[in-house]
Amino acid sequence: MKRKLSWMCAAVIGLSAFPAFMTAAAPAMPPLINAEPTEPAQSPVTEAPVVAQTAPSREVKLTFAQIAPPPGSMALRGVNPNGGIEFGMRSDEVASKAVLNLEYTPSPSLLPVQSQLKVYLNDELMGVLPVTKEQLGKKTLAQVPINPLFITDFNRVRLEFVGHYRDVCENPASSTLWLDIGRNSALDLTYNMLAVNNDLSHFPVPFFDPRDNRPVTLPIVFADMPDLAQQQAASIVASWFGSRAGWRGQRFPVLYNHLPDRNAIVFATNDRRPDFLRDHPAVNAPVIEMMNHPDNPYVKLLVVFGRDDKDLLQAAKGIAQGNILFRGSSVVVNDVKPLLARKPYDAPNWVRTDRPVTFGELKTYEEQLQSSGLEPAPINVSLNLPPDLYLLRSNGIDMDLNYRYTSPPTKDSSRLDISLNNQFLQAFSLNSTQETNRLLLRLPVLQGLLDGKTDVSIPALKLGAMNQLRFDFRYMNPMPGGSVDNCITFQPVPNHVVIGDDSTIDFSKYYHFIAMPDLRAFANAGFPFSRMADLSDTLAVMPKTPTEAQMETLLNTVGAIGGQTGFPAINLTITDDSAQIADKDADLLIIGAIPGKLKDDKRIDLLVQATQSWVKTPMRQTAFPSIMPDEADRAADAQSTVTASGPMAAVVGFQSPFNDQRSVIALLADSPRGYQLLNDAVNDSGKRAAMFGSVAVIRESGVHSLRVGDIYYVGHLPWFERLWYALANHPVLLAVLAALSVVLLAWVLWRLLRILSRRRLDPDHE
């Protein structure tokens, strides 16, 4: 009887658990084919974490086009079955819901059911999508619920393809084994905000969170129109946050006596403070305080207090250089003393040019220089260089490469391919005995390569401000074979490859010399201002009454330069007095309007004034900027004057009239909308890439650049290098000079031989 009761209880419990089991197995249901995804049923294991009911939430859609490796789509193959995306979660938020919406197409040759797509989150299996007969060769839409309890600060979604095209004697490298993931696939997330204590020990969180991959948007609030000292303090803080944001990008909207509905930085003194701080006690030292937004406790404000503007500057430098000591809800910045002066070209984000650099110094994460798999993924190393590095007559760049790899089982065509900026450099065989795994290379740069069998010239390699050095280890993997009756199969073993941290690359033998104006150098590297990482050689010229849009342009610009150099602009000088321009040996950054002393139409090729504008266009405009632009091509061909009602902005570069080695970059706009276009261009990497030459015109349609006007040179070259540079663009003149040199040398030798012959034949000569 007890046994019967036990069986009955087990049956009842099993039936009660059956619906939950079916719900939990929802991800494994066949996906929809050419249909919109349906909302999956929620299982008990995917319940949201407990948060306050009043906590604000936000919904995020992360498409594969945004977060997957370029181009956003994934091609999963038999020998390379894994693909994935990565995303972070802010420390002041918690995920309450997550759904992966996949768009994929399986090969029509796959065996149904035996072939499948597995979805992992942080190596936890979230769901399995079997490939059905109806899906073969067709675009398929599927939803996979993600358990939010497994979402952490940093997350990796891995897609693993298990493919079979026959029951026996399969070849994993068969071209019929594939499954393509579309770039429209997306991860839908719902985040709830958490109440955060006012504790600066976590600074810069929540104002900047390294786990957040989105561009940093951090409003800056002033009591009213800021004076020069407040502008400088805000620039220091903005550039420091820009240096932390790095590749994410940054934006600093400016507000006068108005609080945004998000985390923000507030500047206030005892005499000048926003209205919401009117009851705050006066301070007697530079103070940095974290407090709640008066209308929303989930929003935090970082208030930079001071008795006067001098205190604000000290507090700003404390944020930039002493934040590691922050703790509690407020700190007092007693003193900030510079110990060592910055040197030219010592930006932390740039490759050192004073000595050889190890690859270990170039790493940005721990496992960057290693890879594994039947076909190991490429190893990439970023090289951010000063844009004025002179490489025209260089024989190459010295690189001492130390690498390790899994030996090929036989002597075959396995090799290591080295590429720079997607252009092939050299290939080296991977020996089965590993007799040699250290290479002394010289990477050819800007000299051209000749194919050994034809007269076709391979395009010369060019190093820019941002470069990618790629190492591809390509293995010729032996695969099983045989017939159905006599099949040979084995389990493939992944290959492992490592580039040694002690490998070096040397840029220390090159001069600094560049043809200016070059807006590409400014857009991609902040040059010439970034030559000194702390902007100590930069003078920013602001209007006497800057608007919010003009202040935002200043902060966005110094923030972008900070992101490119990795160092804050602690020594930037700002002025609104054009009389000080001539007395300062510095590069000029002009916001708003060009001062009268610089208005010389021989130097400036674009002026934006109200709704009227004029521009000089060059005689010949090429699709890509030349390394050595021809003087005839850049001569002004026509001047057009246009009056229009639409907004326009411009970035203009020209030589300083006060110093031949100094440059002027002017950021101009004709209206508030024009400044919005200008700020969008400064913060958009795609629009920055379209800037080159001396003038970049920004309209609603995009960015159009011109190289027009005089070219000048910044830097130093020895006289013989300068001579070669001058003659490099004039081959006929070079040939004439070479011929004259040969004739002159021949004449000197002839005269010398005549003298020697005369002496030898002279009987009176002893």
Curated annotation (Swiss-Prot):
It comes from Salmonella typhi. The gene is bcsB. The keyword Cell inner membrane applies. Residues 751-766 are cytoplasmic. It is a single-pass type I membrane protein. Belongs to the AcsB/BcsB family. It is found in: Cell inner membrane. Residues 36-729 are periplasmic. One of its GO terms (cellular component) is plasma membrane. Tightly associated with the cellulose synthase catalytic subunit. Pathway: Glycan metabolism; bacterial cellulose biosynthesis. It comes from the Bacteria. One of its GO terms (biological process) is UDP-alpha-D-glucose metabolic process. This is Cyclic di-GMP-binding protein. Residues 1-35 form the signal peptide. The chain crosses the membrane at residues 730-750. Pfam families: BcsB (PF03170). Keywords: c-di-GMP, Cell inner membrane, Cell membrane, Cellulose biosynthesis, Membrane, Signal, Transmembrane, Transmembrane helix.
